[in-house]
Swiss-Prot record:
Residues 55-72 have a biased composition (Basic and acidic residues). Belongs to the YiiE family. It holds the Pfam family RHH_1. InterPro entries: Arc_rbn_hlx_hlx (IPR013321), CopG (IPR002145). CDD domains: RHH_CopG_NikR-like. This is Uncharacterized protein YiiE. It comes from Escherichia coli O6:H1 (strain CFT073 / ATCC 700928 / UPEC). Residues 52-72 are annotated as: Disordered. The lineage of its organism: Bacteria, Pseudomonadati, Pseudomonadota, Gammaproteobacteria, Enterobacterales. GO terms for molecular function: sequence-specific DNA binding.
Amino acid sequence: MAMNTVFLHLSEEAIKRLNKLRGWRKVSRSAILREAVEQYLERQQFPVRKAKGGRQRDEAVGVEELCKQHKE
């Protein structure tokens, strides 16, 4: 999977906590942040208008479904 670079501004406290976690888990900060973002996106639901039986209704869908619908 291709990776892109993202720049974040974090508080000193967040960096300290991230560094402690990095040392404890023996993985890079990037790996921890990537995992956190992926978990966050998995939990998110987005309301999308979908046609069902000739009428529109709101339906919550996950990120993957939203991206799939956007491509169609």
